[in-house]
């Protein structure tokens, strides 16, 4: 098996702002694994919040190149378990590698990934489209630029309720709110009341990740469901979220790929938690991998490639929130 690493700098359509940062370009690592005439592709993007850079990921993968290239024809579970000890401090690199291996494995088997997992896709949820923090006029213009059935609105400002009130005047779409750890306990509970009146479906990670007492209080008193994001990073976190959140948002780059992400979703479902997968600002390589988990999800946020000025791959397509699969096997990706 041959490992190929590529670095890209993805240009965004608009400056993207959340409560922590603003970006115009998104650095991205694409991993390709070649074997027996097949190629599998995976992706992970840089993330300043987690101190992840593309050169760092490449360096971590280069260190174990021989181990990766000598591990072939194992199931993705066995492959992940073998590689995890070497990359346990770089889950982003592990994710890109795991996505590529799952893609390659399914292509060798002659199946789409969701077919290999025996999933049926008739009830797949629609993806939301993210509106980053900006002036209200800019946020309204972003909505008008792309009419969509569900919007995820990034908040964490002093005018959050006013922003949502103003946006609501311009659309009947479902709203989801992501405060990116920007609120306190009372603020979250009070905001939930106001936001429910404004047609908000749920709140995502309103408070700091480690505020477990606060999460429990909000869980009891919020009139809207609350979904964990930063509080649910790796497999061990799912059980902690029980009785503290109504659901979990799994990010593949944070947990180490599709292999552990799939297990996290299965555990969440057993615990009666709502399930969601979220994306980063990334290309169709990463987004196409997420698509194969859709049959297991209540919600999904996989609009990352829609935020790009120019994509670097083809794969799944998204129109008006509805995800359509590529005709190709594996995750269905082709690099442009």
UniProtKB/Swiss-Prot annotation:
Binds 1 Mg(2+) ion per subunit. Belongs to the mandelate racemase/muconate lactonizing enzyme family. Substrate binds at residues 130, 152-154, 251, 301-303. CDD domains: L-Ala-DL-Glu_epimerase. Coiled coil: none annotated. Its cofactor is Mg(2+). Its EC number is 5.1.1.-. This is L-Ala-D/L-amino acid epimerase. Mg(2+) binds at residues 178, 204, 229. One of its GO terms (molecular function) is magnesium ion binding. Keywords: Isomerase, Magnesium, Metal-binding. Catalyzes the epimerization of D-Ala-D-Ala to D-Ala-L-Ala. Has broad substrate specificity and catalyzes the epimerization of a variety of dipeptides containing an N-terminal Ala followed by Ser, Thr, Val, Met, His, Phe or Trp (in vitro). One of its GO terms (biological process) is peptide metabolic process. Pfam families: MR_MLE_C (PF13378), MR_MLE_N (PF02746). Part of a large, functionally divergent protein family. Protein modeling and substrate docking were used to predict the substrate specificity, prior to biochemical analysis. SUPFAM superfamilies: Enolase C-terminal domain-like, Enolase N-terminal domain-like. SMART domains: MR_MLE. PANTHER family: D-GALACTONATE DEHYDRATASE-RELATED, ENOLASE SUPERFAMILY MEMBER DDB_G0284701. It comes from the Bacteria.
């Amino acid at each position: 098996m041959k490992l190929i690493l590529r670095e890209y700098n993805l240009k965004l359509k608009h400056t993207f702002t959340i409560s922590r940062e603003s970006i115009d370009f998104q650095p991205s690592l694409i991993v390709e694994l070649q074997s027996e005439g097949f190629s599998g592709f995976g992706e992970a993007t840089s993330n300043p919040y987690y101190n992840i850079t593309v050169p760092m990921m490449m360096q971590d993968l280069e260190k174990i190149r021989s181990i990766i290239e000598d591990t072939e024809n194992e199931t993705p579970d066995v492959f992940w378990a073998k590689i995890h000890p070497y990359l346990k401090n770089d889950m982003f690199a592990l994710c890109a590698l795991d996505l590529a291996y799952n893609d390659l494995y399914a292509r060798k088997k002659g199946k789409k990934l969701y077919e290999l997992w025996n999933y049926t896709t008739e009830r797949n949820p629609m993806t939301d489209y993210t509106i980053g923090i900006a002036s209200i006029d800019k946020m309204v213009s972003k909505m008008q630029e792309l009419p969509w059935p569900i919007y995820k609105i990034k908040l964490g400002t002093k005018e959050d309720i006013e922003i949502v009130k103003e946006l609501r005047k311009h659309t009947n779409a479902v709203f989801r709110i992501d405060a990116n750890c920007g609120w306190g306990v009372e603020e979250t509970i009070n905001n939930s009341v106001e936001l429910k009146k404004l047609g908000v479906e749920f709140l995502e990670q309103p408070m700091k990740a480690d505020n477990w007492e606060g999460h429990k209080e909000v869980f009891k008193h919020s009139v809207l469901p609350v979904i964990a994001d930063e509080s649910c990073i790796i497999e061990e976190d799912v059980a902690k979220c029980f009785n503290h959140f109504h659901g979990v948002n799994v990010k593949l780059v944070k947990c180490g790929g599709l292999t552990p992400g799939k297990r996290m979703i299965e555990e969440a479902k057993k615990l009666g938690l709502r399930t969601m997968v979220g994306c980063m600002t990334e290309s169709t390589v990463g987004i196409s991998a997420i698509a194969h988990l859709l049959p297991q999800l209540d919600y999904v946020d996989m609009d990352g490639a829609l935020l790009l000025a120019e994509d670097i791959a083809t794969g799944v397509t998204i129109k008006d929130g509805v995800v359509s699969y590529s005709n190709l096997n594996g995750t269905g990706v082709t690099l442009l």
